Swiss-Prot record:
PANTHER family: THREONINE--TRNA LIGASE, CHLOROPLASTIC_MITOCHONDRIAL 2, THREONINE-TRNA LIGASE
Segments forming domain TGS: 1-61
Residues that bind Zn(2+): C334, H385, H511
Lineage: Bacteria, Pseudomonadati, Pseudomonadota, Gammaproteobacteria, Pasteurellales
Record's protein name: Threonine--tRNA ligase
Functional description taken from the UniProt entry: Catalyzes the attachment of threonine to tRNA(Thr) in a two-step reaction: L-threonine is first activated by ATP to form Thr-AMP and then transferred to the acceptor end of tRNA(Thr). Also edits incorrectly charged L-seryl-tRNA(Thr).
Pfam families cross-referenced by the UniProt entry: HGTP_anticodon, TGS, tRNA-synt_2b, tRNA_SAD
GO BP terms, alphabetized: threonyl-tRNA aminoacylation
Cellular compartments per GO CC: cytosol
HAMAP family per record: Thr_tRNA_synth
Family of the protein in this entry: Belongs to the class-II aminoacyl-tRNA synthetase family.
Known EC number: 6.1.1.3
GO molecular function, one term: ATP binding
Length: 643
């Protein structure tokens, strides 16, 4: 007679083994109708699964994150059901969930078109609206293999042969005539799977191996109700408008090409933004008492073996050879900074030493993962390493946290998710060292009153880290900043200082990045601002234009005055109507447009408009120069009189 303990601590006793759904029915009809699955003793189980012994139970509904993930997984099966009806010869591979949705890899002898995708989606909805029950059956390994051999599913047979023990009892989920194999759980009825959208088709190698056959991957999104789906699709439309790749091309910021995959060709305007970010961070480095250094681009393999990178990071490192020596192009800056620290004797009185670098790094990321500025192979880190004593850890980490929030707020990012990533399976250093490192970061977070999420096993191989993820205007998270403790690397590279008792001790090293990759950060703010950069970051801060040729000399004088004031200003003297010029520069997102007609010349002024169409009236050139200089100096996010 199992006793079921519910989340509120109440208990229900049954005189026979009972399913998750039966417990929900015992609680109430409304809950039973909403039940998707259950969490039995912390493990997700299907609604039909039977509980035979005392257990804790949490009912999962569509309102739960787990429930939504199960809906998405079942929509992948629904996709399989529909495509199998429309294309009986298709071979089904895998259909997992991903963030916000799902996909299914299929093997079909022709390429799927948009018309095909529309037809599959239509059939999915028709099937879901029949509200059929999903039936789960446990079978032997051989029964599962016989089932898929009979159905002509070689990929399912390969999964059984290569990934599932012969003694296992796989779960087969029956969707009417369609059968799929999965760990589950899945929805008990397809009434839960009626709010979805198929999005695109892409190529994907079986098992992710380029030596295997290329399959077609059908992506979709699924939600608990119509409103959630509509809101998500609206966010996608807005994200597409803000895509940094499109905006980057429209504003002539940068380009990338096949001959240098994952490497950025910065154009003048994009490089202007890049340098402004560097200048801004440099002001903060001075404020927080950092020294700036520059390490070499590549170093001998021997050094990377000492650090552990060669053993733990080799797949992501570019290497080269010269004069019978093997070198690695640096994927990170920390080993070089330790070499700088090691030059000359250091005393405890010298610590902390805060060493910063805009370090050019390269990582051999898989080509399929590259994505505009967001995922590149060559990037610049606003990197720093702090060498300190154990007693200084909390104060130094606290200073890093303050600096992170200080910098992010300048860009308008105030919604920041904080995560503490702990020891991974593949790591260097002792458990005792990791205990101290993780406790040190947790103490600093507690001292600063920050709530945080623990990410088990997500730390780097040499230390735990705090991650700062920015939430943008579309609710997306971008992981940028990190503060990472490292008790291992300084010792591996023989870094020491003279302690107060004249003994030699190894310093603690704190890895710190705020923007992370500057390239990626530019991609993030391009999408956050939709290309409408604040005046201090805008490549061109103002354009001065004439109405007729008679104002050309005056325009040139205005441009010179503003340029001499340190502002980025251009003249537009083309023989075009002023309305045409304004429209063009508005599309280029230039913050201010200054129009000079005969009236403005007579008054010694300029007529000022913003890129959002606001007419600000007329100003003397000196007045406008002072206004814009103040906006740049204070790094304001809004333009003059902008809501």
């Amino acid at each position: 007679m199992p006793i079921i303990t519910l989340p509120d601590g109440s208990q229900r006793q049954f005189d026979h083994p009972v399913s998750v759904l039966e417990v929900a029915q015992d609680i109430g009809a409304g809950l039973a109708k909403a039940t998707i699955a259950g969490r039995v003793n912390g493990e997700r189980r299907d609604a039909c699964d039977v509980i035979e012994q005392d257990a804790t139970l949490e009912i999962i509904t569509a309102k739960d994150e787990d429930g939504l993930e199960i809906i998405r997984h079942s929509c992948a099966h629904l996709l399989g059901h529909a495509i199998k009806q429309l294309f009986p010869d298709v071979k089904m591979a895998i259909g997992p969930t991903i963030e916000n949705g799902f996909y299914y890899d299929v093997d079909l002898d022709r390429s799927l078109t948009q018309e095909d995708i529309d037809a599959i989606e239509k059939r999915m909805l028709e099937l879901a609206k029949t509200n059929y029950d999903v039936v789960k059956k446990r079978v032997t390994w051989q029964e599962a293999r016989d089932t898929f051999e009979k159905r002509g599913e070689p990929y399912k047979m390969a999964i059984l042969d290569e990934n599932i023990e012969r003694t296992a009892t796989p779960a087969l989920y029956h969707h009417l005539e369609y059968i799929d194999m999965c760990r589950g759980p899945h929805v008990p009825n397809m009434r839960f799977c009626q709010h979805f959208k198929l999005q695109k088709v892409a190529g994907a190698y079986w098992r992710g191996d380029s030596k295997n056959k290329m399959l077609q991957r059908i992506y979709g999104t699924a939600w608990a109700d119509k409103k959630q789906l509509a809101e998500y699709l609206t966010r996608l439309e807005e994200a597409a408008k803000r895509d940094h790749r499109k905006i980057g091309k429209a504003l002539d910021l940068y380009h990338m090409q096949e001959e240098a995959p994952g490497m950025v060709f910065w154009h003048n305007d994009g490089w202007t933004i890049f340098r402004e970010l560097e200048t801004f961070v440099r002001t903060k480095l001075k404020q927080y008492d950092y020294q700036e250094v520059k390490g070499p681009f590549m170093m001998d393999r021997v050094l990377w073996e000492k650090t552990g990178h060669w053993q733990n990071y080799a797949d992501l490192m570019f290497t080269t050879q010269s004069e019978n020596r093997e070198y690695a192009i640096k994927p990170m800056n920390c080993p070089g900074h330790v070499q700088i620290f090691n030059q000359g004797l250091k005393s405890y009185r010298d610590l902390p030493i805060r060493m910063a670098e805009f370090g050019s790094c390269h990582r051999n990321e898989p080509s399929g993962s590259l994505h505009g500025l967001m995922r590149v192979r060559g990037f610049t880190q606003d990197d720093a390493h702090i060498f300190c004593t154990e007693d200084q850890i909390e104060s130094e980490v606290t200073s890093c946290i303050k600096m992170v929030y200080d910098i992010y707020s300048t860009f308008g990012f105030t919604n920041i998710a904080v995560k503490l990533s702990t020891r991974p399976e593949n790591r260097i250093g002792s458990d005792e060292m990791w205990d101290r490192a993780e406790a040190g970061l947790a103490a600093a977070l507690a001292h600063n009153g920050l709530e945080y999420e623990i990410q088990e096993g997500e730390g780097a191989f040499y230390g735990p880290k705090i991650e700062f993820a920015l939430r943008d205007c579309l609710g997306r998270e971008w992981q940028c900043g990190t503060v990472q403790l490292d008790f291992a690397l300084p010792g591996r590279l023989d870094a020491t200082y003279v302690a107060e008792d004249n003994s030699r001790k190894t310093p603690v090293m704190i890895h710190r990045a705020i923007l992370g990759s500057i390239e990626r950060f530019i991609g993030i703010i391009t999408e956050e601002y939709a290309g409408f950069f604040p005046a201090w970051l805008a490549p061109t801060q103002a354009v001065v234009m004439n109405i007729t040729d008679s104002q050309s000399d005056y325009v040139q004088q205005v441009v010179k005055t503003l340029s001499d004031a340190g502002l980025r200003v251009k003249a537009d003297l083309r023989n075009e109507k002023v309305g045409f010029k304004i429209r063009e520069h508005t599309l280029r997102r230039v913050p201010y447009m200054l129009v000079c007609g005969d009236k403005e010349i007579a008054e010694g002024k300029v007529a000022v408009r913003t890129r959002k169409g606001a007419d600000l009236g007329t100003f003397t050139v000196e007045e406008f120069a002072e206004i814009l200089k103040n906006q740049v100096r204070s790094r304001e996010l809004k333009l003059l009189n902008e809501e």
